[in-house]
């Protein structure tokens, strides 16, 4: 005896449900992935606002700094991201660049006038979050202190 499976139409094989994520979730994912084209599209289409503090407790620029992607940071700044925006713990993007050892991003933020003496809710300045092994950041802040 031979088994013949019931024929199913292509329509019944398609999922009847689809998952849709909120724009902010998709936007932050594009930032983390460094997908500059999609990040730009979201901003130009006004699907997101750059001053929002998301469920992660951070803004878009904070997320870009954490990803270590300077080009994404530059793109967000180009579209108006605030380089002094604070996350829920009072950290600025410069705090994050120093804490996560991204000297190229810290240098860029400082070149735009980011405040190096601003303190977070724990009273820490960005330079106090630098790992002493990150010589480039240590040197960057030691030369900036003399300015």
Per-region residue spans from a language model:
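Ankyrin-repeat-protein effector appendages
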Residues: 1-27, 112, 119-147
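N-terminal segments that cap or nucleate solenoid repeat domains
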Residues: 11-59
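Ankyrin repeat start-site detector
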Residues: 22, 55-56, 88-89, 121-122
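Conserved ankyrin/ankyrin-like repeat signature
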Residues: 38, 71-72, 104-105, 136-137
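Ankyrin repeat domain, specifically the short helix-to-loop turn at the C-terminus of the second helix
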Residues: 43-48, 74-81, 107-114, 142-147
């Amino acid at each position: 005896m031979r088994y013949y499976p019931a024929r199913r139409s292509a329509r019944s094989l398609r999922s009847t449900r689809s998952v849709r994520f909120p724009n902010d979730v998709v936007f932050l994912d594009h930032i983390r992935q460094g997908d500059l084209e999609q990040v730009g599209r979201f901003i130009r289409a006004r699907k997101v606002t750059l001053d929002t503090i998301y469920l992660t407790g951070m803004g878009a620029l904070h997320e870009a700094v954490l990803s270590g992607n300077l080009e994404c940071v530059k793109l967000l700044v180009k579209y108006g991201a605030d380089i002094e925006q604070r996350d829920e713990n009072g950290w600025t993007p410069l705090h994050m660049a120093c804490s996560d050892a991204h000297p190229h991003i810290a240098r860029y933020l400082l070149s735009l006038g980011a405040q190096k003496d601003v303190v977070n809710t724990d009273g820490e300045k960005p330079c106090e979050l630098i790992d002493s092994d990150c010589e480039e950041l240590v040197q960057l802040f030691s030369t900036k202190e003399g300015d």
